Regions:
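Conserved RecA-like helicase motor-core motifs
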Residues: 2-13, 195-199, 417-423, 427-430
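Conserved helicase motor
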Residues: 8-18, 36-42, 377-379
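Inter-lobe coupling linker of SF2 helicases/translocases
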Residues: 18-64, 82, 86-89, 93-118, ...
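Basic, amphipathic N-terminal segments
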Residues: 59, 66-81
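Walker B catalytic acidic pair
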Residues: 122-123
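A mobile, often basic/glycine-rich helix-loop segment
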Residues: 133-148
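Conserved strand-helix element at the start of the C-terminal RecA-like helicase core
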Residues: 314-318, 368-386
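Conserved helicase motor "Helicase C" RecA-like lobe of SF1/SF2 P-loop NTPases
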Residues: 379-430
Length: 430
């Protein structure tokens, strides 16, 4: 209760106030400074740390190129000749990226002057897209090799902290979500010295030691046919990797939680989820894709679009796989997210089925003031959207005599308007 804590909000981190904040952190003896993920990048990194990572990435790129040249020289039939022009362009890109970072830093006070001795990152999986070099080609499951600016910035901060014997703590429930390479990145963040001691700084060396490429048939992006895929998807030497991981990880399992509090995780009704299946309308079927006699799918459908995107590089403004899957998610929820003017048909609407289910549960439990939690991943109001105002109506006495199902239908109809981004526009207060 007596801790001296600074909570940074968006007003403190504006360009006008930023320098004041940096001085405030540097010149006060705070026990903790709490800052949002989105603001962390605005805390400058030491120039020597940035220069050091720049040189390391250049050396890594050169090493990978030399390995590719040697592999081609030893076995030209099995290995592709490395593209020297592409290699030089990569070096230029790395230099340009770090020069831009240094220029953006300006003359701000950096974290080395702020007295930071412990960095604790909640939801650390949001920083998993750390850039890396690899000579592995046409291998799925490697993750995002380009990385993100957010991850690179955090990596710069962890490098500074490691070099100065400071502390780092990551908190996450999903250390590995999409790719085995995320374990490698976690080790780069938290135990870089352990990787160096074992000669595993390069991803390729780490992957050969702890991973395995599996060849198998997989559904293509359209989910209509199979293709052979080489995927980095299997751990090897699990015992050795587990020992490295447990050297820095404090693992809390669901069983551990239940030992301390047997009722912490509520029991699922019926011991398993209840799947509510809603029939697909003709509009949704056409939008997803209907097979034609020639084996193709109707023009403009999701499957048709995904087949056309297969194997193509994403270009700005053009259709891509992510856009297709986003549209597929929208139409799977409610066709009105695709066509706001479409008529709501009860038997084909998941949102209607959900609302009806929630209302039925309400009728069963309202006498004991039962509580429900509803989760929906699409078409939810954002902070900048219209606010919903719930007030006790003047005619409260009349509500007792109304038909609850009719009211539910009217409520659903009133929520049938969406903005251009597919977000629900709440009914006005009037």
């Amino acid at each position: 209760p007596n801790a001296n804590v600074l909570v940074v909000d968006s007003k403190d981190i504006t360009e006008k106030e930023r320098e004041l904040l940096y001085n405030q952190i540097a010149n006060n003896n705070y026990d903790a400074v709490i800052i949002a993920h989105t603001h962390l990048e605005l805390l400058s990194n030491p120039r020597e740390i940035i220069e050091g990572l720049k040189e390391e990435e250049l050396v890594n790129a050169e090493t990978i190129f030399e390995r590719q040249e040697l592999a081609y020289k030893n076995n030209p039939r099995e290995n592709k000749k490395p593209n020297e022009r592409a290699f030089k362009n990569k070096l230029d890109k790395i230099r340009a990226q770090y020069d831009a970072i240094l220029e953006k830093q300006g003359s701000h006070i950096d974290i080395s002057q702020m007295g930071i001795d412990n960095l604790i990152v909640d939801e650390a999986h949001l920083f998993k897209n750390l850039a890396f070099e690899t000579s592995m080609e046409k291998i799925a499951g490697l993750g995002n090799q380009q990385g993100s600016n957010r991850a690179r910035d955090l990596y710069l901060k962890t490098r500074y902290l490691h070099q100065n014997n400071k502390k780092i703590m990551f908190l996450t429930g999903t250390p590995i979500a999409n790719s085995l390479s995320e374990m490698y990145h976690l080790q780069r963040y938290l135990t870089p010295d352990a990787l160096k001691e074992r000669g595993l700084e390069f991803f390729d060396d780490w992957a050969k030691t702890y991973g395995e490429v599996v060849n198998d048939f997989e559904l293509d992006t359209s989910a209509q046919s199979y293709k052979m895929v080489n995927r980095f998807s299997k751990f090897s030497d699990v015992q050795g990797l587990s020992a490295m991981y447990r050297a820095f990880a404090d693992i809390v399992s669901n069983d551990d939680i239940l030992k301390h509090n047997p009722h912490f995780v509520p029991k699922v009704y019926g011991d398993k989820p209840i799947n509510v299946v809603v029939k697909r309308s003709e509009e949704v079927a056409q939008f997803i894709g209907v097979a034609l006699e020639n084996g193709k799918y109707n023009e403009g459908s999701i499957i048709d679009r995904m087949q056309k995107c297969e194997g193509k590089k994403n270009k700005k403004g053009q259709d891509n796989i992510l856009s297709c899957t986003t549209d597929a998610r929208k139409v799977a929820l409610d066709y009105r997210l695709i066509d706001p003017n479409a008529k709501m048909e009860k038997e084909f609407s998941k949102s209607y089925a959900m609302a009806e289910n929630i209302y039925e549960n309400y009728l069963e439990t309202h006498a004991t003031k039962g509580t429900q939690l509803g989760f929906i991943g699409l078409s939810t109001p954002k902070t900048h959207s219209q606010k919903v105002s719930l007030e006790a109506p003047d005619n409260a006495h009349e509500i007792e005599n109304t038909n609850p199902l009719d009211e539910a239908q009217e409520l659903l109809e009133s929520l049938s308007s969406y903005d251009k981004n597919g977000n629900l526009i709440a009914p006005s207060k009037k």
